């Protein structure tokens, strides 16, 4: 809170405040005048002045602090001295103190009324002694006045209680804290018990131990914050914890209850002070640049800005300004600068700083200086700070000595002669002395040969050089001088420089895999030895190989690969592996992104490419346009799912099937309507064909004459022009010599080649007919009448003689009829239709019996094939059991040691029975009920007495109205067992009955219907006719007597309905677990 030095600095009082104040002063008979004087008043005096100014205005502005406009808030008096935001020209702390002072004055006023009533009673007693007449009147007046004062007092107390808030919620509703600063708001909330702890969300009482965050100044219960600190440190395993309000890191773990300024521990609660305050001046420093302590009493929240006036100098210290300390602290980033030149002496000691007022050192001197070279012929400009060290050069010109400072070498050759006057200096520009240098070729300087190994006097055989111009002799030794590369010169002693090094070195190549021989001169010229080895290391992308010759990163890659982990850690290691710079792939990735429209522009990399960042700023509508995505739309986004129906027109012009809107790339559901269509061959018009089916076939043979003009097309119904292009059938013409048909490929337009022997099979026999043999015809142009003779053997004559003897004695000798009688009619009928399968089963079972194995498993097969295996195994004395559900149901055969093979093969028995049909066969009933009813057995694998009587199908849950029998028969026409029977169809209101008529030939009608029901149900559901097909019993009046329920072999009952999209094998997989064919 800022204090004013002059009463005139106080805020001006509004007119209504002055009037109310005068009335209050008259009623209390007190005069309140503000302190005057030029000196800075006491802080408490200034607060009292502000309180007096606001005191009377509370009645009009009380609605801002309390919902009741008739009474202000009664807050205990406290010394709140803060610099807060202004509220209608008054300070928030003044408003709080004014409320407390108003409370005190009301209490004093109530006490004064009580004292005056007592004085009136005493005066009434004294008047009774002096005048009896006046006693009654005076006493009555005093009594009435006392009663009136007491009544007034009680009314005022009741009004004050009614104006007092009932709870903290009502106080909070009546306060407008939005215009107060943080400190004032905290004081009001703490005094009125409105401040809540952010940990437990309970109110903070003035007498409760607290802790305040030094960053956000938020207040918490001390017990709550200690528990928060302990749990946070234990969970995070760190020394620091976070403030629950501002999340700032706190390192202090021993938390104590201190006052706001931190000077007093466990401050006592004083009624007239700010809660949790020690009552002493705060004394905190405000910022790094401020050295003045806070003058306010101990308070919550941040300290107000410093109002002290300080003097601040400019950067160069020549000028200064006076300003508030807080304002100076705020503008630390923009220091005060004057307009003067620094003028400080620079480090060179000669020049001064020419910069404008600045901070820090002046820096190096950049004053330009013109410097000469050592020889004095050239000069250039240097900054003063970078001027090199000078050297004194002296030169004698025409008897006078010229002297100057040389700072650098101009690199030009020196033109001065040595003292001999014959040789010139060969050095570049250098400092010059006044005297000439001694000649390096002088006889007193040069006493040895150039390599330094022999004396010149020795080489000249006792003679000496007389002058520096005499030739210098050389010796026969190797020079041996140390070259710049470190090797020695290998030439003979010579004059001048040694030249280049010719030493041959063996060093590793660039990839360090091989060694290469090079000269030292090549290495000095930058030659890099390489080999022809190709680097096969994978690059950083993991797709491409290096394929460089003699790669310099090969050895680094080997080291990197050796450090790779193995196992599961390798996958994560590859994501963060650092590659050598030689093996970083710089090719563009160029893979197609997930959007399908753009390509990856990153460098070739491991793992998947990032998602496409392209976006469209146009709306993306669905096909019908009623659902759309608004921009920006990421590239590759599919069109949105539309909940509305599809509006695409159909080419057939039938009504559209109800389905949701979809992209045009997806076709609409096929048209379910039935129409008439002409078949592909054009012979027939087929009815009840689905509209979506384009190619309709009648199933008849084409029978069009082929190009050979002899044979006819044997393809089934097909479009025109798709007949067999070239005839590859047998010729079929009668041969000339044998009358068999020609078996050569069709050769229309050419006669048959009679030179080729006929390959037609023939069966010839001996004269008695016992021996039969199959041969080929072999008739040809060269052998028109081939002879195929079979001679009789001795056995033939014996059998012929025995036959004649048996006939004479009337004895039957044919035992084959007994062997054929062992077989049943069902076995021989099945063999006539499926001879290959029956031969294979017979061969397997005969081998199984001969090998004396205990069991044999057949592969999965169809129902009628399993029935044949069961019947034939029973005939052989074997036991057979079916396992596994459809379509992998198979038969297991067991040999219990009672097997017996028939004398005649099934093939022979069938052939002999065809020749002698009068032979009686074994009845099917003798093979047991399982084989007798194998082709029409119950789907559960067992027959129950309750299943008898069922004689028809009933179709329920009809999907569409059907009034034509052909619609049902066209769907079930390709079921073989269904076509063997004659059916009658009866139409009801909500059902259709399918009743077989010729059921007398069926041994087990219920088993037959049970076997047919799943396939019939499936076909009718796929055709959209009925979703349920059940077995029922109908009487002579065509009324349904009972319906067979579906039984499932499991512990729990289940009612499964046929799903059209599933196969028959998954309709009821529990039923297939039972023993079945």
Curated annotation (Swiss-Prot):
UniProt KW keywords: Cytoplasm, Golgi apparatus, Metal-binding, Nucleus, Phosphoprotein, Repeat, Transcription, Transcription regulation, Zinc, Zinc-finger
Region (Disordered): 1-173
Basic residues bias: start-end ranges: 15-29
Domain of life, source organism: Eukaryota
CDD domains hit by this protein: NF-X1-zinc-finger, R3H_unknown_2, RING-CH-C4HC3_NFX1-like
Keyword Hydrolase tagged: no
Sequence ranges of Basic and acidic residues compositional bias: 52-64, 100-116, 153-173
Modified residues (Phosphoserine): 33
Composition skew (Low complexity), residue ranges: 136-149
Pfam family, one: zf-NF-X1
GO terms (BP aspect): negative regulation of transcription by RNA polymerase II
Function: May play a role in transcription regulation.
Name of the protein in its database record: FKBP12-associated protein 1 homolog
Gene: fap1
């Amino acid at each position: 809170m800022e204090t004013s030095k002059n009463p005139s600095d106080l805020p001006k009082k509004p007119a209504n405040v002055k009037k109310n104040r005068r009335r209050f002063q008259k009623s209390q008979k007190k005069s309140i005048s503000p302190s005057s004087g030029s000196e800075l008043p006491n802080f408490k005096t200034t607060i009292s002045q502000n309180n007096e100014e606001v005191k009377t205005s509370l009645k009009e502005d009380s609605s801002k602090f309390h919902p009741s406009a008739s009474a202000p808030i009664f807050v205990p008096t406290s010394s709140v001295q803060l610099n807060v935001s202004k509220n209608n020209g008054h300070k928030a702390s003044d408003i709080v103190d004014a409320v407390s002072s108003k409370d005190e004055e009301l209490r004093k006023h109530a006490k004064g009324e009580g004292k005056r009533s007592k004085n009136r009673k005493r005066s009434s007693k004294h008047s009774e002694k002096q005048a009896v007449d006046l006693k009654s009147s005076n006493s009555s007046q005093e009594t009435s006045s006392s009663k009136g004062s007491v009544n007034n007092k009680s009314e005022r107390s009741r009004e004050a209680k009614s104006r007092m808030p009932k709870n903290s919620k009502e106080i909070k509703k009546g306060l407008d804290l939005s215009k107060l600063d943080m400190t004032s708001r905290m004081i009001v909330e703490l005094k009125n018990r409105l401040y809540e702890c952010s940990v437990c969300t309970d109110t903070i009482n003035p007498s409760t131990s607290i802790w305040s965050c030094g960053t956000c100044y938020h207040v918490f219960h001390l017990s709550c914050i200690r528990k928060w600190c302990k749990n946070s440190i234990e969970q995070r395993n760190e020394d620091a914890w976070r403030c629950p309000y501002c999340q700032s890191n706190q390192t202090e773990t021993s938390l104590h209850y201190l006052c706001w300024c931190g000077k007093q521990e466990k401050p006592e609660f004083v009624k007239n002070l700010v809660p949790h305050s020690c009552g002493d001046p705060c004394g905190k420093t405000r910022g790094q640049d401020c050295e003045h302590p806070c003058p306010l009493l101990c308070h919550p929240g941040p300290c107000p800005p410093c109002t002290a006036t300080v003097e601040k100098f400019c950067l160069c210290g020549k000028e200064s300004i006076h300003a508030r300390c807080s304002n100076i602290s705020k503008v630390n980033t923009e220091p005060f600068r004057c307009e003067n030149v620094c003028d400080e002496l620079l480090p060179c000691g000669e020049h001064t700083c020419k910069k404008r007022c600045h901070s820090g050192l002046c820096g190096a001197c950049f004053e330009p200086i013109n410097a000469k070279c050592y020889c004095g012929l050239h000069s250039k400009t240097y900054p003063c700070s970078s001027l090199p060290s000078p050297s004194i050069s002296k030169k004698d010109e025409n008897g006078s000595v010229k002297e100057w400072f040389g700072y650098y070498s101009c690199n030009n050759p020196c033109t001065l002669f040595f003292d001999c006057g014959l040789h010139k200096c060969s050095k570049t520009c250098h400092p010059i002395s006044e005297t000439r240098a001694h000649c390096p070729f002088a006889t007193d300087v040069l006493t040895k040969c150039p390599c330094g190994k022999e004396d010149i006097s020795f080489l000249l055989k006792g003679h000496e050089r007389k002058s520096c111009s005499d030739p210098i002799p050389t010796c026969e030794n190797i020079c041996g001088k140390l070259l710049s590369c470190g090797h020695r010169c290998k030439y003979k002693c010579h004059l001048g420089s040694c030249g280049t090094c010719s030493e041959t070195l063996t060093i590793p190549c660039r990839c360090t895999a091989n060694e290469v021989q090079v000269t030292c001169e090549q290495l000095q010229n930058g030659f890099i030895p390489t080999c022809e080895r190709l680097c096969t290391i994978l690059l950083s992308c993991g797709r491409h190989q290096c394929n460089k010759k003699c790669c310099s990163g090969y050895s680094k890659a080997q080291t990197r690969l050796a450090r790779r982990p193995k196992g599961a850690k390798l996958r994560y290691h590859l994501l963060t592996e650092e590659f050598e710079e030689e093996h970083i792939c710089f090719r563009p990735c160029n893979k197609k992104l997930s959007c399908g429209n753009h390509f990856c522009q990153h460098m070739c990399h491991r793992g998947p490419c990032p998602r496409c960042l392209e976006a469209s700023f146009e709306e993306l509508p669905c096909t019908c346009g009623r659902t759309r995505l608004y921009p920006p739309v990421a590239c590759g986004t599919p069109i949105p799912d539309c909940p509305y129906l599809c509006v695409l027109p159909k080419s057939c012009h039938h009504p559209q099937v109800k389905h949701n809107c979809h992209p045009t790339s997806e076709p609409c559901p096929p048209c379910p309507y039935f129409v008439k269509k002409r078949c592909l061959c054009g012979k027939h018009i087929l009815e009840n064909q689905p509209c979506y089916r384009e190619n309709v076939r009648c199933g008849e043979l084409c029978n069009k004459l082929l190009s050979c003009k002899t044979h006819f097309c044997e393809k089934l119904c097909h479009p025109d022009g798709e007949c067999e292009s070239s005839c590859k059938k047998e010729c079929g013409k009668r041969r000339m010599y044998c009358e068999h048909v020609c078996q050569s490929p069709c050769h229309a337009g050419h006669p048959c080649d009679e030179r080729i022997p006929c390959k037609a099979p023939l069966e010839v026999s001996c004269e008695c007919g016992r021996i039969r043999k199959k041969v080929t015809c072999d008739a040809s142009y060269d052998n028109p009448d081939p002879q195929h003779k079979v001679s009789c053997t001795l056995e033939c004559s014996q059998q012929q003689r025995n036959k004649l003897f048996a006939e004479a004695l009337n004895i039957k000798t044919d035992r084959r009829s007994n062997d054929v009688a062992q077989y049943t009619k069902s076995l021989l009928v099945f063999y006539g239709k499926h001879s290959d399968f029956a031969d294979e089963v017979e061969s397997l079972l005969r081998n199984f019996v001969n090998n004396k194995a205990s069991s044999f498993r057949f592969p999965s097969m169809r129902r009628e094939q399993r029935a044949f295996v069961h019947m034939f195994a029973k005939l052989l004395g074997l036991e057979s059991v079916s396992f596994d559900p459809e379509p992998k149901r198979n038969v297991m055969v067991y040999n219990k040691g009672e097997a017996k093979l028939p004398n005649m093969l099934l093939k022979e028995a069938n052939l002999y029975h065809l020749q002698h049909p009068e032979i009686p066969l074994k009845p099917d009933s003798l093979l047991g009920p399982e084989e007798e009813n194998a082709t029409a057995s119950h789907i559960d694998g067992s027959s129950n007495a309750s299943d008898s009587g069922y004689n028809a199908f009933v179709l329920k849950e009809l999907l569409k109205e059907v009034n034509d029998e052909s619609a049902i028969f066209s769907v079930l026409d390709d079921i073989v067992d269904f076509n063997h029977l004659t059916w009658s169809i009866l139409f009801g209101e909500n059902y259709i009955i399918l009743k077989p008529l010729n059921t007398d030939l069926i041994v087990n009608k219920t088993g037959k219907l049970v076997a047919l029901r799943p396939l019939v149900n499936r076909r009718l559901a796929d055709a959209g006719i009925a979703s349920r097909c059940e077995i029922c019993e109908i009487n002579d009046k065509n009324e349904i007597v009972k319906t067979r329920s579906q039984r499932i072999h499991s512990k729990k009952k289940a009612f499964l309905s046929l799903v059209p999209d599933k196969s028959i094998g998954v309709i009821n997989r529990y039923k297939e677990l039972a023993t079945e064919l």
